[in-house]
């Protein structure tokens, strides 16, 4: 599914967003429709500054006031990025790079953000900050598709959960329902 949201080939089924089939579109066409992917391992433009990374996220907007409004929103959510605006993105810590990736996603006018493994490689305290930021983004009304192996945290955040095994959905439901399934707990959830 993630690959389908990025414009990669889907071998079986289809990916739809806002009623439109998107799995055959190019990544830039998908972004224009408001579905933004925040990739695993963050992937900032390492040689660019924090500010230039954020501005790269607003390339679809030609309105300077709109861009400034988006920057203010990103800096309100991630004040540390405002402090590091001129710093080269490749020199940021892993947690700061994750914050930058989320802030850049907000700059795209996201209607939905697909976030891939946001806690990967982060210290526990930083992980908590990142998940708080994701919750704040969701509280603004932006739906989040969260792919996360930190299952306890994912269960705390999600209204609906899907458990995948080898690319197939093997269970779905609320966190309480999935945690109550003893077979699933032992085989897939690691609980």
Regions found by a protein language model. Give the residues of each.
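Glycine-rich phosphate-binding loops of nucleotide-dependent enzymes
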Residues: 1-191
């Amino acid at each position: 599914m993630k690959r389908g949201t990025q414009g990669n080939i889907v071998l079986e089924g289809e990916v739809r967003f806002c009623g439109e089939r998107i799995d055959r579109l190019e990544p830039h066409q998908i972004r224009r429709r408001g579905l933004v992917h925040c990739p695993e391992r963050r992937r900032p433009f390492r040689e660019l500054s924090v500010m230039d990374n954020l501005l790269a996220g607003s390339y679809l907007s030609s309105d300077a006031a709109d861009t400034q409004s988006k920057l203010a929103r990103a800096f309100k959510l991630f004040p540390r990025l405002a402090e590091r605006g001129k710093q080269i993105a490749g020199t940021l810590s892993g947690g700061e790079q994750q914050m930058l990736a989320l802030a850049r996603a907000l700059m795209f006018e996201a209607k939905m953000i697909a976030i891939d493994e946001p806690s990967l490689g982060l210290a526990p305290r930083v992980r908590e900050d990142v998940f708080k930021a994701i919750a704040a983004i969701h509280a603004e009304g932006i739906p989040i598709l969260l792919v996360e192996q930190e299952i306890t945290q994912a269960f705390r955040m999600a209204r609906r959960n899907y458990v995948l095994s080898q690319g197939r959905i093997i269970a779905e439901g609320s966190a309480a329902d999935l945690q109550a399934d003893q077979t699933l707990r032992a085989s897939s959830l690691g609980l």
